Amino acid sequence: MSLKNCYNFDDFRKLAKKKLPAPIFHYIDGGADDEVTMNRNTDSFNDCDLIPNILNSVGEPDLKTEVFGTKMDMPIFLSPTAMQSLYHPDGDKASARAAEKFGTIYSMSTMASFSIEEISNLSSGPKIFQLYIHKDQSITNDLIDRCKRANFNGMCITVDTIVAGNRERDHRTGFTTPPKFTLDSLMSFAMRPQWVFNYFTNKKFELANLKDKVEKGTNIAQSVMGYINEQYDPAMNWEDAEYCIKKWNGPIALKGVMSVEDAKRAIDIGCTAIMISNHGGRQLDGSRSPFDQVKAIKDAVGDKLEVILDGGVRRGTHVLKACLLYTSDAADERSSVDLGGRRII
């Protein structure tokens, strides 16, 4: 199987499984606990039927929309994905180029493989930054200040990851960042020689936005769950979010809102948008799917907030269903990068 033979998301997933070592593939592919929520995110779209009205003159469809104060050519954008250079050497650079090519937003993770400044210099397309609030407030402040200097268009504060989800696939494979080549994992890496070649002949893996502040994750191997539990602030509260909103002073969303009550409170602290998200089912297994929660939240907040659905999106009809339930936009974080990302978009 090659890129030219990939026609849907499942095709790309099969190709990724073929090309990536098991620890890398299962990190990006897996979810929390029994992965019920992860699978439900997509199943909820499939449980919703479309009833088309015919003869409505759609010869010149207009897919344009606006979110984070940014005009986009389509109602989808790339949700933030960590450590993309583990999946392709160009990592975040390829994602940013693909988003710019198709007139949509690129979202950068705090745990990106390339820095805020590198991506800003590479792409003139719209960009938002996904912020994790760290225990060390100087890290959080530094990230916000750098995004301001780099002229990012918006920011989203991830609020559903103050402690790590129980990702059992990662326990089994021993996934760490950077990857550790142990006796247990050696065979898996050895069976993917092209990945190994790319890993050792391209830019050294690093958490580019954090490397000057935190050694673990770049120079010292650590599990992602260990990093989250050690570095992210479990005491984060509404006051902390409001502080970041005021410091950023621009278009901003809370990412990880699932309840009507929290959506209403996001308005009160100055958010311009919310991302209805359960972190792709990677945090709390058993939570509701974003698609099933969209209408209740949108009915509650009206036009006071942009409402963005994150997670489970696999096809254009999924985007259509989300838009019909009043979202401003749809995002997904499991897309590939480079040519694969362009074909998926």
Regions found by a protein language model. Give the residues of each.
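Conserved, mostly hydrophobic/aromatic
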Residues: 21, 78, 99, 157, ...
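Hydrophobic faces of well-ordered beta-strands that scaffold small-molecule active sites
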Residues: 76-79, 106-108, 127-131, 155, ...
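Glycine-rich beta-to-alpha transition loops that act as phosphate-gripper elements at the mouths
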Residues: 110-112, 134, 254-260, 306-319
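Conserved small/polar residues in nucleotide/adenosyl-binding loops
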Residues: 326-331
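Alpha/beta enzyme core
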Residues: 145-155, 162-288, 293-307, 324-325
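An N-cap/entry alpha-helix motif that binds or orients negatively charged groups
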Residues: 2-72, 178-236
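Glycine-rich active-site/cofactor-binding loop and its immediate structural neighborhood
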Residues: 73-109
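Acidic (Asp/Glu)-rich catalytic clusters
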Residues: 117-124, 267
